[in-house]
Amino acid sequence: VTQADVGSALANLKIPGVGSLSQSTICRFESLTLSHNNMIALKPILQAWLEEAEGAQREKMNKPELFNGGEKKRKRTSIAAPEKRSLEAYFAVQPRPSSEKIAAIAEKLDLKKNVV
C-alpha cells in the first residue's frame, strides 16, 4: 500500500472533518517531521485506518474463496527438452501458425494450447 493509497483511504473512513491526506503528509508522519500537534492530531485517524485495514485483511484471509479468482499467480511453465525441440522445429517452419494448427501441435505434444 502506497502513502498516496493511505491518504485516499482515509476519506473512506467517514470521520467527521477528515478528508483524504496527501502523500507528503503521510510521508512526513512516517519520518516524524510533522509538528508535535499535527502528529497528535493524525495518530488516532491513522490508527483507525490501520485497524480497519488489518480487519479487512483478516476477514479476507479467514473467508473461504468461492472461486480462485484474479489474485492467484500462474506458475511458470517448464517444457521438457524433447517437446521444446519439437516446438522449435514447428515454429521454424511456420512462425505464425493458425489457431487450429496450434491446437493440433498442443494435442500431439500433450501440452495445453495456451502453452504452445
UniProtKB/Swiss-Prot annotation:
Residue span, POU-specific domain: 1-54
Signal sequence range: none
UniProt region (Disordered), positions on chain: 56-79
According to the entry, DNA is bound by residues in: 72-116
* Coiled-coil regions, chain positions: none
A Gene Ontology annotation in the biological process aspect, one of them, is: cellular response to estradiol stimulus
**GO CC field:** cytoplasm; nucleus
Q: Could you tell me which PROSITE patterns the record lists for this protein?
A: HOMEOBOX_2, POU_2, POU_3
Major location, coarse class? nucleus
Q: Report disulfide bridges, numbered on this chain.
A: none
- Which Gene Ontology molecular function entries are recorded, alphabetically? DNA-binding transcription factor activity; sequence-specific DNA binding; single-stranded DNA binding
Q: Which Gene3D superfamilies match?
A: Homeodomain-like, lambda repressor-like DNA-binding domains
Q: Where in the cell is it found?
A: Nucleus; Cytoplasm
* Keywords from the UniProt entry: Cytoplasm, Developmental protein, DNA-binding, Homeobox, Nucleus, Transcription, Transcription regulation
User: Which SUPFAM superfamilies did the record assign?
Assistant: Homeodomain-like, lambda repressor-like DNA-binding domains
Functional note: Multifunctional transcription factor with different regions mediating its different effects. Acts by binding (via its C-terminal domain) to sequences related to the consensus octamer motif 5'-ATGCAAAT-3' in the regulatory regions of its target genes. Regulates the expression of specific genes involved in differentiation and survival within a subset of neuronal lineages. It has been shown that activation of some of these genes requires its N-terminal domain, maybe through a neuronal-specific cofactor.
The entry's family comment says: Belongs to the POU transcription factor family. Class-4 subfamily.
For this entry, the protein name equals POU domain, class 4, transcription factor 1
What species is given as this protein's source? Gallus gallus (Chicken)
Q: Which gene encodes it?
A: POU4F1
